[in-house]
Amino acid sequence: MTERKFEPGDLPQVMAVYHDAVHTLAAPFYAKEQLDSWAPPDAKMDRWKERLAPLQTILTEHEGLVAGFASYNTAGHLDLLFVDPRFARRGVATRLCSWVEN
């Protein structure tokens, strides 16, 4: 696994990681209506572009797949941290947090 900075072409994979993480990893703790509100299936790419624009975003990749991503502001405060469920509990979030801390 490797970390790198987000590029605009990564947006579809980042959106998919977010959606899948919310609907899989958070599913035991929230009602479906809450999950759909938090991560709607018809999320708009333009809204995501606006959301990420003021932030620094990094990715962890594994064999060309986005395993997770983190977005943080200029003060280093995390705003978003999500891991693809296929890579859960494999140290992805730890790697991303270490990048942000350094």
Each language-model region and where it sits:
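Acetyl-CoA-dependent GNAT
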Residues: 5-9, 16-86, 94-99
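Glycine-rich phosphate-binding loop
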Residues: 91
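Conserved GNAT acetyl-CoA-binding A-motif
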Residues: 102
